[in-house]
Amino acid sequence: MLELWGVLSLTSLGVMVIFLFSKIKSSFAESVKYAGYMNAVLLSILLMSDESEMLFLKWEWVKLGGYSLMISFRFDLYTCCFFVVGLYVTWNILMFSFYYMSTDPRIDLFCKYLGLFLIAMLLLVSAESLFQLLIGWEGVGIMSYLLISWWYARSDANTAALQAIFYNRVGDIGLLIMLMWSLVTLGDWSFTGLYALDFVNTFFLLGVVLAAAGKSAQLGLHPWLPAAMEGPTPVSSLLHSSTMVVAGVFLLIRFSPIILNHKEIQLMVFFLGTMTTLFSAICALAQNDMKKVVAFSTASQLGLMVTVVAGAGAPQLAFLHICMHAFFKAMLFMCSGGFIHGLQNEQDVRKMGGLHSAAPITSVCFFIGSAALMGVPFLAGFFSKDPIIEIININNLNSWAVGLVLIATSFTAAYSVRLLYFSVGGVSRMLVLQPMNEEYGNLIGPLQRLAYSSVIAGVVFIYFLSPNQISCLSLPLSLKLAAVFVTLVGGLIAWDVVNLLHREESVTNIPELAFEAQVGFYPLIMHKLIPKVWLNMGEMYQMQVMDRGWTELALPQGLGGNYKIMADNVVNAQTSLIKMYIAVMVMMGGLILGIMICL
């Protein structure tokens, strides 16, 4: 069965590449749709046949001396599920792009870039070697730069694209460390060879953590993710849901068997994910840009995924949350884009309100997506977040970090309720200049399909993506209902936050809100203060040490000054006094004569 899956999946990728260069913009979207349908049917057959083995398809690409560079594909449950989710979500985003980018003269090129983005991610997920993973890794990085800077006339878009490249370059150093260590130690880049090792050097695992932190925007390398929403909404929807940002989490999932054998690295990843999910949730509470709130929610959920990979030792649950998160996060960005598009590009939620009457279908989908993000029972987010909270509660790593995860979960509900209150609820706070027409099939169709998925996908995926090793535990009712309880607490916090932000005084006068609104002052420190210090030091060194310092005195000014002194002495000697000249000649002659007599 897996042989058929591998052949047909690779065939579908080849067909998508062919249609990628078609001049008809809808042809590629149709190829993605049918490829997704085919992979979904194959996944259903695979699950019913109860096959759990893996398939490796390998071809020798280049042979250098005694080393062969292989192109190899790894088809397991992770690969099969992600193919279905990625193709399905991307198809809906492509259809939404036909509505959102309808006035863009380069819409054909835009859709091709989205397709290449997807293909690079599928190549990364199906990779069986570090070399092939590097190709997909760099592919999603390059395409993210091209798509975020799509509106190249906007300085903010270009700055955001450069941030994405620079921060991901830091993460790429970790991937290069992995490649070099693997080649020197093993002479092989395959995952199978790494899994077979009895001991893996900590240096290699630090590279894994650095690479994942850069690509999945963990704390310290996170500023590029909120800034990436400067690109078109379809780009944000695809980037935040099922492509680039989950690549780092997927890397941790692939190497989780090795990470879980190193307690120090496991604890490091656990704290990194915990601090990321809490910090991002706190920052989302005080943001007023609709897309930025959704972007920070992505960073918070990525931190939760990283936490469960290492802290709970359950990579299956992290992957389950990746799949569930893809459905409702893509829908949230598309709903936000629909609102912003209808409000003449207004993104400030304080100027919205009453959108449930102007755009009822989009508002309902936005509510479903927010509820799924909060983890409301029986939606997709509940089936992934509730097991995560349960398994983190029973882990024996660190109770302090577990408490922070619960606080972050309550904050998720808080900023989601706040966003719903300001945008969909209440009365309109601005005049809608253009009616929000919901009769476009390319607007409503993708939203409805993703809304259905956000409702029923959890029931489908939970059965075959549950942890393989389940401990027989009897949890008290308080821990069992912890996820639902913190969600309710977050809803209550949201009302206080709404009232707090209705005050007349400036947000910057409230230290707590200033910290949240300014993203912990991290962009101010990293993008302004530190570069300014280094530039001032460079200017001081160049102007005071180099140009006007010892080099100036030793070379240009020094040589000129010495020559001037010599010239002045020569000038002073030319006094035009004949008696002086005769006296000097007599003295010099007498001196020379005396020396000759002595010798």
Curated annotation (Swiss-Prot):
Reactions catalysed: a ubiquinone + NADH + 5 H(+)(in) = a ubiquinol + NAD(+) + 4 H(+)(out)
Transcription regulation listed as a keyword: no
One Pfam family in the UniProt entry: Proton_antipo_M
Membrane-related topology note: Multi-pass membrane protein
Cellular component annotations (GO), alphabetically ordered: mitochondrial inner membrane; respiratory chain complex I
Protein keywords: Electron transport, Membrane, Mitochondrion, Mitochondrion inner membrane, NAD, Respiratory chain, Translocase, Transmembrane, Transmembrane helix, Transport, Ubiquinone
InterPro entries, alphabetized: NADH_DH_su5_C (IPR010934), ND/Mrp_TM (IPR001750), NU5C-like (IPR003945), Proton_antipo_N (IPR001516)
EC number of this enzyme: 7.1.1.2
GO annotation terms (biological process): ATP synthesis coupled electron transport; electron transport coupled proton transport
Parts of the chain that traverse the membrane: 1-21, 28-48, 81-101, 115-135, 171-191, 193-213, 233-253, 265-285, 302-322, 323-343, 363-383, 398-420, 455-475, 481-501, 510-530, 577-597
Localization in the cell: Mitochondrion inner membrane
Keyword Mitochondrion found: yes
Function: Core subunit of the mitochondrial membrane respiratory chain NADH dehydrogenase (Complex I) that is believed to belong to the minimal assembly required for catalysis. Complex I functions in the transfer of electrons from NADH to the respiratory chain. The immediate electron acceptor for the enzyme is believed to be ubiquinone.
Protein family membership: Belongs to the complex I subunit 5 family.
Name of the protein described by the UniProt record: NADH-ubiquinone oxidoreductase chain 5
Organism, as annotated: Branchiostoma floridae
Lineage: Eukaryota, Metazoa, Chordata, Cephalochordata, Leptocardii
